[in-house]
Structure formats: C-alpha cells, structure tokens
Swiss-Prot record:
One of its GO terms (biological process) is translation. It comes from the Eukaryota. Required for mitochondrial translation, possibly by coordinating the assembly or maintenance of the mitochondrial ribosome. One of its GO terms (cellular component) is mitochondrion. Keywords: Mitochondrion, Protein biosynthesis, Transit peptide. It holds the Pfam family DUF155. Belongs to the RMD1/sif2 family. Residues 1-5 form a transit peptide. Homooligomer. This is Required for meiotic nuclear division protein 1 homolog.
Length: 450
C-alpha cells in the first residue's frame, strides 16, 4: 500500500514539472509529521504542506504504522546536466523518463496545483476504498433468514391466561377438544359403557346430539368428573384426570368421521378453570363459578351450557387453522399477478379450491350454531345467559365475522382466476377457429389455381 501511494505521487503532473530543477528525487520513511509542517528546498522555496488534506487517514489493519514521505530537493550545478532519476507509474507498469537535458537554471515561483491536488485526493480515496472492501474484508454468502411462521388462529387459546391450579386447591379444570368432523354416538356410547364409564340419561329430550358420561374417579374431590361428547366432533372434560382423558381420546379414534391432525387437536383446545361457590353460576374474569347448592341434574345442564360454547370455540379454531392453510396455498397467486408472471393453476384446480371454500363457508354459516342461539335455550333464560356470556368471552361472533371476511376475499380471488382461465380458453378456441378457416381458404385457393 505505501509503495503504491509513492508511485501515484511520483506520477503527478505538478511534481514532474517541479522535478526538472532537481538533481534527484529521494523517498524516505521518517517519523510521523504533525498536522502542519513545512519542508524547505535549497533553492529558497518553502512549501506549507497540510498533510491530512493530501493523505486521508487509513484504517486498514495492514497500515497501522503511518509512513510519511519527505521530498528533498537538491539544486544541481547549472553547468552539469543530469536526467531525472524518477520512475513514473502508469496503469500498473513502470515508465522510465526520457533523457532530455535540463535547461539553464532559473528561479521560479511555485504555485500549488489545486486541480492536481484534488485528483490526488480522489485517487487515494478510490484506492483506499478498493483495498478495504476487497482485500481486507472478503465477501461472504449470508444465509437467508426465514420468516417466522404466522399464528394459526384469530384468538389464542384461553389456557395462556389461566392461574396455576396448585395455588388454589379448590380450582378444577375444564378442557375442550375438537378431534373430528363427527362422532358416531351410538357405538361410542356402547364402548364407553363397556369400559366402565356411566352414561347420564337425565338430559331433556330437546338436548339432542349430545352424550354425557360420568367417570368413577375425578381429578379433585368436590365435583364428579363429567364428559360431554357432541356429535359435531368435540369433547369437553370436567374435572377429569389426564390419564382418563387420554384413554377416552383413544376410544374416540374408532368412532370418528374425518379426524383431524393430532398436533392440531392438542394445540387448538380451550381450557377454563372452575370452582364451586355459593350464589348464582356465572363466568367471571375467565373463571367459571358453579352454584354448589344445585342438584346433580341442574348442575349437568349448566355445565352443558358452558360446554356448548366451548365446543363452538374449538370447532371454530380448527376451521380457522384450515382457512389459514388454504390462504397459504393461494398466497403466491396475487404476487404472481402483480409481477406479471404466469399462474400455474389449471381449471380443475381452481374449481377444487372454490369447492373447499364453499364447503368451509357452509359449515360455518349453515350447519352450525355460530350465527344464532340454539333452540334449546329459548325457554331457559338462565342457561341462555351462561351460553351467551361464554361465547362473548371466547369472541365467537367476532371470529366468525373475521372468517367470513377472509372467505369473501378468497372467493373473489378464485373467481378472478376462474374468469382468467375462461378467457384463456375462449382465446385459444378463437385462434383454433382462425387457423381452421385459414387452412380451408388455402385449400380453396389451391383448388382454383391448380
């Protein structure tokens, strides 16, 4: 690096012009100079040099020790002629100067060449930047950072806000799962009874599509363990041991229609704590308070109201995850349309996507109780209040609204793709007709002329 700077300095036009009066040009490595220091020539010329305007600071590791060059001009005898002992460096090659004799010695007034100085500063800066970027800091291929995965539901499970059960021994747990699209309650009831569970048959007749089972040993004393199994494919466990829950889930696998993924089932669940207290049953700050003075049948009905809302929540969570997965599958279509690229989807695939959307929309809006209150609560105001409060806490209405908006957007996108494919098909048919007409005209012309 210092040798290149010296050769660059030697090639300057101003130094070459001033060197015609010198006998030799010596380059020495001396101690670092101060910011402003003067060098005196033997011919009486004093040049004030501002070092940091000509030599920018170099921060490379290989240039830790600054090397300052000092130019000593010694005036030669006017009667003797000497060639210029300097080497010019141009385009990376050495160029020796021509042997032209010097003229007679004349006193000259030296003026700083500002244009050459500016060029020298630019050259040094350009050379310094090239060294620091290429030689000292080699380029490295940085790995691409992947985006974090998006959350798969509109509302996170309520279990994240639950207090620890060990703090209050009276707290019991209610857990809801959605494992399939539908259960076969008849065969399921028979197998559970054969396994030692007790079926509760005291529910009203209008409480259809529900199977209530009692367990012998509950997780905590004070409330009997109860299991609510809905035909829609959801199970709600009240004060049931974890070992018992796993056994029931294994039994459910043999009576399911279109089961869901196990990981999705265990993630998209709902957990609420409940406690037996005096007074009216209610949902207060995410905690269910059951009236301890009620008899077993009334307590089962109140648990059914809470379980019904939890069943809707976990089913909606599964459908939210399904919709998010569908959105990820068509996420590349808007980007491809924006970039002007060709969308690689056939007409059959587009119609299949539309069928998935219509099926999901039908489940949410037509075959479930998300939009209206079930008929079971019309003449049971106290149970309807518990059901509505739980749905409000679980944000059922808002989540359904968000899902319908997403479905509408996906429907518009699939309609756009279907229209685009129809236009392409129509254009292809038009071109086929044009080609056929052209062939027919050519045959007619051949018949006429030949």
């Amino acid at each position: 690096m210092p040798s290149r700077l010296l050769h660059t300095l030697a090639s300057l036009h101003s130094i070459s012009a001033k060197a015609h009066q010198c006998q030799r040009l010596t380059w020495l490595t001396l101690r670092p100079l101060r910011k402003s220091e003067s060098t005196t020539c033997h011919n009486g010329l004093t040049i004030q040099q501002h070092l940091h305007s000509f030599f920018p600071s170099i921060t490379a590791d290989s240039l830790n020790k600054p090397e300052i060059l000092e130019m000593s001009r010694i005036t030669s005898d006017t009667s003797r002629l000497f060639p210029l002992n300097a080497v010019h460096w141009l385009d990376g090659k050495e160029h020796w100067p021509s042997m032209h004799p010097f003229g007679t010695h004349r006193s000259m007034t030296h003026k700083p060449n500002l244009l050459c100085s500016k060029w020298f500063i630019k050259a040094v800066k350009r050379h310094h930047s090239s060294v620091s970027n290429e030689a000292l800091v080699p380029k490295q291929d940085l790995p691409q950072i992947k985006r974090p995965l998006k959350a798969s539901r509109t509302r996170q499970p309520s279990r994240t806000n639950l207090p620890d059960l060990s703090v209050n021994e009276d707290l019991m747990q209610c857990t809801a799962f959605a494992t399939a699209d539908e259960y076969h309650l008849g065969s399921l009831s028979q197998e559970l009874v054969s396994c030692g569970y007790v079926e509760v048959t005291s529910l009203p007749r209008d409480a259809a599509n529900i199977l209530v089972m009692g367990v012998e040993s509950s997780a905590k004393e004070g409330d009997p363990g109860t299991i609510f199994l809905f035909r829609e494919g959801a199970a709600v466990f009240w004060n049931v041991k974890e070992k018992t829950m796993k056994h029931v889930m294994q039994v459910l696998e043999r009576h399911e229609t279109q089961p869901y993924e196990v990981a999705l089932v265990h993630w998209e669940n709902e957990e609420l704590n409940y406690i037996k207290t005096e007074g009216q049953s209610k949902l207060h700050r995410g905690e269910i308070k059951l009236n301890s003075e009620l008899d077993l049948d009334d307590a089962i009905l109140e648990k059914f109201a809470f379980s019904n809302a939890l069943c809707l929540s976990v089913k909606l969570a599964i459908w939210e995850a399904t919709l998010d997965k569908f959105i990820e599958s068509i996420q590349s279509i808007p980007e491809a349309l924006k970039a002007g690229k060709k969308v690689k989807l056939s007409h059959k695939e587009v119609m299949q996507k539309m069928g998935e959307l219509f099926a999901l929309r039908h489940r949410i809006n037509l075959s479930s109780d998300f939009l209206i209150t079930p008929d079971f609560y019309w003449d049971r105001a106290n149970l309807e209040e518990l059901y509505d409060k739980t749905c409000q806490f679980l944000s059922i209405t808002r989540r359904v609204k968000v899902m319908n908006e997403k479905l509408q957007h996906c429907m518009e996108l699939t309609d756009l793709m279907r229209n685009h494919l129809n236009e392409k098909r129509a254009l292809r048919l038009e071109w086929m007709i044009v080609i056929l007409i052209t062939i027919e005209v050519m045959f007619e012309l051949g018949r006429v002329f030949f």
